């Protein structure tokens, strides 16, 4: 309790000074480069243990810091260790904003569904402060009262990924979903599976079976995973068809930071099973050209830069849905080495990627017109 009290006191101080917090480390400005306490402040409160996932949340961090450099704002990025700690951070900030008497502009960003109920219950408290604003993502349901929301539709990009997964995959294609409840996860999985089912397989000599697997049955579960659990899942998928015989596996990990435990399991066994691979999700993972078939990406870092710019101009939209047509999502094919060809050349010979993108955009839009 004492540590929590100290942490909350530190946040209180940081809200009115010029520092940046990453995890448990507080960075003070370089001497001679101090920013005035009147400089606009962007505060991000991540979900529990989500920063450091090397994908979605790390891209948000990257985007916020890029915006700080571009626009000259201060940043405070908080990585709570538990939901309780994150809620305590939020309560401290809301209380301070209710009582603040200065005119410093502050934007609070919450990129986690863990805080959904709290945000929707308390966001109106910020209406007492004309200089405080809120950005909650990702959700399809706008906030009542103060605050903006946006949603990045992953269906189209994942549809492309499902079509492309036919090329270079043998035996088993395993889609790992964090849970069946989180909307972003569920719709991403639906898009990938639809794209896969709508496309012909590249070679009938090498049949492929699609296997969908959930990591958790909890509404916000499945985004973290122990290495031992990942190794068990890996071995189960390796023997999906037979206990006596190994099969090739391609993993599609739509499960946040848990994907990296799967990657470690895959790389640990790479000398034994050199045909196993994965599809990178959220971030560009094509640097791993031995194992990453291609990447389906969310450009959340660029979206954050744009939104902070809109906030500074006082033109942040109340709600917005972005997707493949907006450039908020896409696929990256560079890097993968297969039969002597890099990823882009390999897919270009087999798929009309421009036409596929247009089909995927249409599929994404059609879902909202029904």
Predicted regions and their residues:
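Periplasmic-binding protein-like
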Residues: 44, 100-113, 135-137, 241-256, ...
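Extracytoplasmic "Venus flytrap"
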Residues: 36, 42-63, 67, 76-87, ...
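Extracellular/periplasmic Venus flytrap/periplasmic-binding protein
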Residues: 184-246
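Flexible loop/hinge segments that line or gate small-molecule binding clefts
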Residues: 127-153, 283-289
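An alpha-beta-alpha
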Residues: 64, 159-207, 212, 319-349
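C-terminal motif of bacterial Sec signal peptides marking the signal peptidase cleavage site
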Residues: 15-18
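Hydrophobic alpha-helical segments within soluble ligand-binding/sensing domains
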Residues: 149-173, 296-316
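Flexible loop/turn connectors
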Residues: 274, 283-339
């Amino acid at each position: 309790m004492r540590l929590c009290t100290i942490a909350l006191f530190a946040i209180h101080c940081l809200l009115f000074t010029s520092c940046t917090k990453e995890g448990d480390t507080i960075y003070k400005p370089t001497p001679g480069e101090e920013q005035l306490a009147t400089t606009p402040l962007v505060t991000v409160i991540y979900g529990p243990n989500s920063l450091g996932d090397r994908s979605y949340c790390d891209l948000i961090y990257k985007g916020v810091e890029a915006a700080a450099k571009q626009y000259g704002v201060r940043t405070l990025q908080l990585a709570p260790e538990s939901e309780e700690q994150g809620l305590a951070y939020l309560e401290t900030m809301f209380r301070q904003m209710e009582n603040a008497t200065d005119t410093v502009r502050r934007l609070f960003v919450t990129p986690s569904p863990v805080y959904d109920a709290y945000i929707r219950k308390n966001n109106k408290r910020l209406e007492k402060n004309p200089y405080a604003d809120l950005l909650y993502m990702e959700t399809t349901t706008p906030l009542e009262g103060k605050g903006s929301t946006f949603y990045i539709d992953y269906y189209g990009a994942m549809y492309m990924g499902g079509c492309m997964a036919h090329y270079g995959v043998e035996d088993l294609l395993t889609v790992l979903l964090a849970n069946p409840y989180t909307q972003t996860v569920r719709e991403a999985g639906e898009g990938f599976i639809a794209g896969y089912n709508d496309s012909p397989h590249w070679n009938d000599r090498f049949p492929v079976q699609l296997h969908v697997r959930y990591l958790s049955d909890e509404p916000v579960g499945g985004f973290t995973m122990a290495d031992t659990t990942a190794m068990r899942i890996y071995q189960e998928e390796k023997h999906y068809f037979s206990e006596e015989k190994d099969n090739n596996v391609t993993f599609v990990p739509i499960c946040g930071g848990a994907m990296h435990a799967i990657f470690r399991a895959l790389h640990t066994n790479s000398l034994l099973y050199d045909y196993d691979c994965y599809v990178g999700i959220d971030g560009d993972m094509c640097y791993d050209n031995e194992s990453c078939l291609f990447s389906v990406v969310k450009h959340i870092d660029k979206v954050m830069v744009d939104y902070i710019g809109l906030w500074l101009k006082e033109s942040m939209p109340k709600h917005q849905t972005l997707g493949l047509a907006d450039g908020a999502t896409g696929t990256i094919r560079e890097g993968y080495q297969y039969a002597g060809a890099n990823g882009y050349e390999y897919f270009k010979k087999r798929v009309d990627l421009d036409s596929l993108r247009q089909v995927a955009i249409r599929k994404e839009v059609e879902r909202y017109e029904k």
